[in-house]
Swiss-Prot record:
It comes from Phaseolus vulgaris (Kidney bean). Gene3D superfamilies: Fumarase/aspartase (Central domain) (1.20.200.10), Fumarase/aspartase (N-terminal domain) (1.10.275.10), Phenylalanine ammonia-lyase 1, domain 3 (1.10.274.20). GO terms for biological process: cinnamic acid biosynthetic process; L-phenylalanine catabolic process. It comes from the Eukaryota. Its EC number is 4.3.1.24. Keywords: Cytoplasm, Lyase, Phenylalanine catabolism, Phenylpropanoid metabolism. (E)-cinnamate binds at residues 50, 138, 144, 174, 246, 274, 277. Contains an active site 4-methylidene-imidazol-5-one (MIO), which is formed autocatalytically by cyclization and dehydration of residues Ala-Ser-Gly. One of its GO terms (cellular component) is cytoplasm. It catalyses: L-phenylalanine = (E)-cinnamate + NH4(+). InterPro entries: Aromatic_Lyase (IPR001106), Fumarase/histidase_N (IPR024083), L-Aspartase-like (IPR008948), Phe_NH3-lyase (IPR005922), Phe_NH3-lyase_shielding_dom_sf (IPR023144). This is Phenylalanine ammonia-lyase class 1. Coiled coil: none annotated. Pathway: Phenylpropanoid metabolism; trans-cinnamate biosynthesis; trans-cinnamate from L-phenylalanine: step 1/1.
Amino acid sequence: YIAGLLTGRPNSKAVGPSGVVLTAKQAFELANINSEFYELQPKEGLALVNGTAVGSGMASIVLFDANILAVLSEVLSAIFAEVMQGKPEFTDHLTHKLKHHPGQIEAAAIMEHILDGSSYMKDAKKLHEIDPLQKPKQDRYALRTSPQWLGPLIEVIRFSTKSIEREINSVNDNPLIDVSRNKALHGGNFQGTPIGVSMDNTRLALASIGKLMFAQFSELVNDFYNNGLPSNLTASRNPSLDYGFKGAEIAMASYCSELQYLANPVTSHVQSAEQHNQDVNSLDLISARKTNESIEILKLMSSTFLMGLCQAIDLRHLEENLKSSVKNTVSQVSKRTLTTGGNGELHPSRFCEKDLLKVVDREYVFSYIDDPYSGTYPLMQKLRQVLVDHALINAENEKDVNTSIFQKIATFEEELKTILPKEVESTRAAYESGKAAIPNKIKECRSYPLYKFVREELGTGLLTGEKVKSPGEEFDKLFTAICQGKIIDPLLECLGEWNGAPLPIC
């Protein structure tokens, strides 16, 4: 087709940018090529139709995207660790140095760089120190072993890139003319096996990257695993009316299945052709085309996952503001109702405040915040339990109405019931209007350029069931931006200070 078009064959057709079918003459005019149609010199026609130019050209485009998506997967794994309150030791230089694999060392170093100094990781460390038993000692595999998982895939993509780089700079026509020896060498440099094999390997690597993203995304939306984030990352006041990212997770499962299907090799399906002259042939263009399909699906997965991470970042911001509001309210109410008795004397219940605030610190905000005073939710149950425990310790004093902590429980709960819902709603309203008392921690992190790109440049926002916008509309904005290459600059900005080496072992 390309050779026919270049030589101006009247029956050759091209498709223009708008989808209109063009003749060769119209295509030349549209491309502003003012010269006549090409007159092919000896061997040039064969080079066009029988060489590896088209396959290697497609492979070059595919591998450019594959390299970008590989780096993006490393950075997204680091952001995943941030929002999941993971333990940063999984990136420790020594662990990966002892394994020797260069791809793994590189992946860990990139994640280590992103997480170094992260406000989220500092907060997570404090959380683990306060209550070491609040979450498992070790993070799950999708987080903890992400450098080991991505490492070999990076090496495969890099090897494939080098292979195609050699191919596009090589001679692949036939025969080759050795002028010095006056020989025509009938060889087979047109055989595109390096392309076919490289594309098969790349496609397998892309499928594995997609599988990791799906595993991480599934953890992110599951409130049994995500360390306090709401189920499906719902952000509405009433989570019962908000499906959140449930549809996105179903889509991710579908993407992952198709990506894994495409990982099947093409080069194992070679058929003999041309009366057994071409009894082996590379199928390089087929493999490159299928890898291009895989690239598109992985872009869909990457955009969905990054939108989920941005949602989680915003929910952590909301969580921090809501927790602060609840904590201040509980503190104020306990001071007013538990400090003194009816006659102004100091009351034994004044010692409860510290333990009451510990409950607020340890309880996941989104487990109760849609109805903070509900007796069926853990906050009120555990606050009451603190007062009951102190009352039991109070022993003999409980017999005196003036020193009884049991007598204070109803007063404390009634005042909290009056004030807490109003304070929570006020905090949420301030957050939604962009006037949150506590700023978003992401601005202090190296992953901020990606978040800023998604939220500010693309104009996306926190997804809630209260809005008319569907999640798919927001995902499409990011997917389109990734396809247009707009994500490259913010991605590289995240790594702008990285010198290509792991942090020193201290």
